[in-house]
Amino acid sequence: MLLLSGIGPRADLEKLNISVVLDNKFVGKGMADNPMNSIFIPAKGPVVQSLIQTVGITELGVYIEASSGFGQSNDSIQCHHGLVSAEIGQLSTIPPKERTPEAIQAYIGRKKDIPHEAFKGGFILEKIADPFSKGQISLINTNADDNPSITFNYFKHPHDLRRCVNGIRLIAELVQSEHFKNSAQCDQLTTERILNWSVSANVNFVPKHTNDTKSVEQFCKDTVITIWHYHGGCLVGRVVDPDYKVLGVQKLRIVDGSLFRDSPGTNPQATVLMMGRYMGLKILRDRLGEAVVI
């Protein structure tokens, strides 16, 4: 919205013949998304359908979460199977020029080809906390109804890739532990097969390298998807001041996830809602006085 309104990097605005209201090179920059990678775990028997309820916070800089019981019918697999169900949400995993309608249709086709048995168990995922890799948002045209181009540059920073590798290795240790013996059989050989299986089962837009799971780094790159915690682009001190007022203009604030340098660990919607309420009350009290009670 700022870019379309003429607030942003001058060169980017002038390229689309947008009148420059304020030249700020930081608008749309410094964006990030917490990359997520998951390993699908086949169960020996039926499992209870369960969304993520517990988060394991490790010293490795990754969060470990789990979900189970998705895909109780063929239709549910093709149309909805948990965190990997949104076609558009995965477009950020490929370069902007490759984000075509044909790519989306190919993605949908791959979803339909996934075996029903793949979703009789569940999955364990790891996501990177506070990613170092940064991206940006840029306009494709001046039509407000069209999506902009967003690139997060997953794993561009080597520290993020190292953390993903450590997280996947930790999950592999978990599924080979005594605790999984009654529900899933995941010895070393089986775990390698599950990793290969997970490469195909993770339905993103990234070209796959199956049978290459000895390279955990490649597994991370092949199976990365969004967990919808993207943030940044209007950072405090660069685009807005500590009261979230846009620097260089009057009577304009931003209160959303674009302010975050780091996204809260789980469900950032709650934090955004809290910020909205806080700023709403602050504005009312600034106008009407501290005695305002809401």
Go through each PLM region and give its residues:
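A conserved FAD-binding loop/helix module that cradles the flavin
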Residues: 262-281
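Conserved, non-catalytic sequence blocks in retroelement Pol enzymes and Pol-derived host proteins
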Residues: 155-163, 265-270
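Short, small-residue-rich loop/turn micro-motifs
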Residues: 141-143, 257-258
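FAD-binding beta-loop-beta segment adjacent to the flavin cofactor pocket
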Residues: 126-138, 234-253
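Glycine- and Gly-Pro-enriched alpha-helical subdomains that act as flexible
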Residues: 147-148
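Short FAD-binding loop at a beta-strand-to-alpha-helix junction that anchors the flavin cofactor
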Residues: 248-264
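Mid-to-C-terminal "cap/lid" subdomains and adjacent gly/pro-rich loops that border
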Residues: 2-129, 141, 158, 162, ...
